[in-house]
Amino acid sequence: MVGRMLSSPEPTLSTMAMSAAHGEDSPYFAGWRAYDEDPYDPITNPQGVIQMGLAENQVSFDLLEEYMREHPEASDCGAGVRENALFQDYHGLKSFRKAMASFMETIRGGKARFDPDRVVLTAGATAANELLTFILADPGDALLVPTPYYPGFDRDLRWRTGVNIVPVSCDSAAGFQVTAGALRAAYDEAVAAGTRVRGVLITNPSNPLGTTAARGVLEGILDFVARHDMHLISDEIYSGSVFAAPDLVSVAELVDERRRARGGAADAEDIARRVHVVYSLSKDLGLPGFRVGVVYSYNDAVVAAARRMSSFTLVSSQTQRTLAAMLSDAAFAAAYVRSNRDRLRERHARAVAGLRRAGVACLRGANAGLFVWVDMRRLLGDGEATVAGELRLWRRVVAEAKLNISPGSSCHCREPGWFRVCFANMSLETLDVALHRLGCFIKKWEQEQHEN
């Protein structure tokens, strides 16, 4: 009897549960596993893997800790435990939605306005992007996404929704900026294959490039989606992490400008209804564990649908009340944004200087984010300028230099040899160790080339 039970087939699961569309086999996630199995610690494991594949902001966490020490009432349930424990509005507490709208305005220098009634809260940007994909597209439809793009989009946009991603190929010759020709080519190819394209998703500032989109590029994308009856999702989760010129131009700013310039004309309102902004506190505030994301739409029907669907991705009332108190303190919010930008600028400069000493070039014009897009194409060698060659190099970096960096192919970059290197999720001392290791690895590689 026992033997028969042990030899019986496994119970079947759903197609979604067994699908490979999650993307967990990507080198992006494989690098995380290498770190998890052998994590670096300066005392207990100094030869371990240093995690440079995680875009996490730890450079300003002391400012948040200081605020909490000075304002313990912000996180103390106290007499408010009943209010926190009972049911609240699914799409977010009014006080927190108001605080989030104000903070989103602050980090954009007041150049865009956000209505708290259009703020829908989600458990992070992952949930926000998936929720919008569910709302805007049906299974089998597609979104255009410029490359290179955040590897998690393969999971966030495709896995549970059944929606496809059509990459918009951008190249280094244009600084990986989105061009009208690239958008048109991707769209035409998808339509020719019988795919209905429902929208364009961009990240601004870009992950993994660490650059902001030019105003003209954004204007062109707005006109493109209007011309082809599509939507635009602008993922702006790094909007408060712009540390150098040029300043961020948010798509929300352009919507406001067009409305003012055209006095509520039908074409300006038509474009506004196609625009949806995603934001999160995971990057700018460094609070990924709090799971706070935002869907902001100028489309009433999208806001209504997002509110209905947000019941699957709620933010706890305690989290909302704590952050509402913090972000409602306008003086603190403004001071934090300034200090965080200064610190990211210094950290970015240190990372770039160390990479250059190691013989690694970085993408020019980078001015935002928690990472550097680095050019290691010269390390691929003759005949190795392929995805396979890039992955062989990546495996060596992980195994020999004990550094987890993200290969460009995991970001769907069509030019092998580019990598994303994160710099804000570790101490300065650990960053220096990582850069030294990379320099030693490259010297070893150069020695091998000389000997061959």
UniProtKB/Swiss-Prot annotation:
Top class in the EC scheme: lyase
Swiss-Prot/TrEMBL keywords: Ethylene biosynthesis, Lyase, Pyridoxal phosphate, S-adenosyl-L-methionine
Family: Belongs to the class-I pyridoxal-phosphate-dependent aminotransferase family.
Keyword Metal-binding: no
Protein name (record): 1-aminocyclopropane-1-carboxylate synthase 3
Record has S-adenosyl-L-methionine as a keyword: yes
UniProt cross-references to PANTHER family, sorted A to Z: 1-AMINOCYCLOPROPANE-1-CARBOXYLATE SYNTHASE 3 (PTHR43795:SF45), BIFUNCTIONAL ASPARTATE AMINOTRANSFERASE AND GLUTAMATE/ASPARTATE-PREPHENATE AMINOTRANSFERASE-RELATED (PTHR43795)
UniProt pathway: Alkene biosynthesis; ethylene biosynthesis via S-adenosyl-L-methionine; ethylene from S-adenosyl-L-methionine: step 1/2
Tissue: Expressed in leaves. Expressed in roots and leaf blades. Expressed at low levels in leaf sheaths and shoot bases.
Molecular-function GO term, any one: pyridoxal phosphate binding
Cofactor(s) the protein requires to work: pyridoxal 5'-phosphate
Residue(s) carrying N6-(pyridoxal phosphate)lysine: K283
Function: Catalyzes the formation of 1-aminocyclopropane-1-carboxylate, a direct precursor of ethylene in higher plants.
SUPFAM superfamilies assigned to the protein according to its UniProt record, in alphabetical order: PLP-dependent transferases (SSF53383)
EC annotation from Swiss-Prot or TrEMBL: 4.4.1.14
Catalytic activity field: S-adenosyl-L-methionine = 1-aminocyclopropane-1-carboxylate + S-methyl-5'-thioadenosine + H(+)
A single BP term in Gene Ontology: amino acid metabolic process
